[in-house]
Amino acid sequence: MGEFQGYLELDKFRQHHFLYPLIFQEYIYALAHDHVLNRSILLDNFGYDNKSSSIIVKRLITRMGQQNHLLISANYSNKNKFLGHNKNFDSQMISEGFAVIVEIPFSLRLVSSLERKEIVKSHNLRSIHSIFPFLEDNFLHLNYVSDILIPHPIHLEILVQTLRYWVKDASSLHLLRFFLYEYQSWNSLITPTPKKSISIVSQRNQRLFLFLYNSYVCEYESTFIFLWNQSSHLQSTSYGTLFERIYFYGKIKHLVEVFSNDFPTAPWLFKDPFMHYIRYQGKSILASKGTPLLLNKWKYYLVNFWQCHYYVWSQSGRIHINQLSNHSLDFLGYLSSVRLNPSVVRNQMLENSFIIDNAIKKFDIIVPILPLIRSLAKAKFCNVVGDPISKPSWAESSDSDIIDRFVRICRNISHYHSGASKKKSLYRIKYILRLSCARTLARKHKSTVRAFLKRLGSGLLEEFLTEDEQALSLIFPRASSTLWRLYRGRIWYLDIICINDLVNHE
């Protein structure tokens, strides 16, 4: 908290940890506009602009309370948001600035926690790909997996109460209540919105929504893991230490009493030393080496946990239990499964010979081709059946710029899906992008694709095919055999922290 106090630089509020005064600082809205919130900006560049603009912000808050136009038509979203008349810009500006402010204590506590644990390369833990080596190492020994959809929407007051344990500023919490209750369409952030309208909150205030949703999930997981550890043979080692919160242990004690009264089940029924929990976005996975009966117990345990503690109605049908050997996990753009590779061994002993059937488990990861084609079709690189088409909006750019754009997209897709066991589907994606690039260039020069490719030669083909090899040659500059073997095998990059729009096909 010392770093947080130093960042505020407000002597008047130093002893109370108030966040509300930051709303009147202009640099907060610069951070919100540029979407560059990170530790270096928070801690190193806090002297960017200390000019107070309380009059402007007060006018925005007053004006925002006098209007209630949350839903707009799809055509209105194409207007200039800054030069045109937009009644929702005031609420958007305040909410984005507020999202930056409430993220400050969370970011600083996370940094101090990582430094206290002496985790040097903490940025690698943020990578999406870091979860797949964990799956490779552990899922081969498990039998059953449960796909879980985290229930929502949650009551608005529960969200405010969740933040109350972290943010000790009543004024900021009152402002948050104002956002949530003033606009009744806040639930459209979580539930689908009608096709004829676009929700201002869901489309333009995603930062505040993501923060509130993540705080809710963090609260749910911290309580769940805490109770899990109380009834397990082995304590969880991968979950970080919980931050100190007001009344946390008192609430946990009350929750344990509620469950002990409502569910008089012996603790050993839930004990499983080989249980793994993984979560990304609104999905989570619970894998176990035990029997389906054990996962069924956890299934109904979670349903009652959500209903009793968060007052969220959840159906048991949202949790599916499957056998790993017969089920594929649709997770982060990959289809992951555990396959049995049969092998026959002939054993010769004197005059007798025996044939031994042996099955070896293998963690298989493939890239689903149809969702990728749908993503390319949505981006206007091909039609719905995968036939490449030109990109007319790019035809006005230079030839080198057009080629560079297509190559960059191809490189990003190959980079993200580098962990696939078989890369045959990626070759088709490269073919679609290459031919779409050729059609775009031919459209620009008013020529046919055949004539343009004949004039260009094999240069365009080399641009698309050598990107992966060039990236690997930087890592293994002297090992050509190793380079080719890695090019055909699985590679996980720990610098990927978000999913590209073309990859996020869920």
Curated annotation (Swiss-Prot):
> Which locations, inside or outside the cell, does it occupy?
Plastid, Chloroplast
Biological process annotations from GO: mRNA processing; RNA splicing; tRNA processing
Instruction: List GO terms (cellular component aspect).
Output: chloroplast
Q: Please classify the protein's predominant subcellular localization into one broad category.
A: plastid
Q: InterPro entries given for it?
A: Domain_X (IPR024937), Maturase_MatK (IPR002866), Maturase_MatK_N (IPR024942)
Q: Which Pfam families match?
A: Intron_maturas2 (PF01348), MatK_N (PF01824)
User: From the UniProt record, which GO molecular function terms apply?
Assistant: RNA binding
Query: What keywords were assigned to this record?
Result: Chloroplast, mRNA processing, Plastid, RNA-binding, tRNA processing
- Similarity section: Belongs to the intron maturase 2 family. MatK subfamily.
Q: What does this protein do?
A: Usually encoded in the trnK tRNA gene intron. Probably assists in splicing its own and other chloroplast group II introns.
Q: What is this protein called?
A: Maturase K
The organism encoding this protein is Sullivantia sullivantii (Sullivant's coolwort)
Q: Which gene encodes it?
A: matK
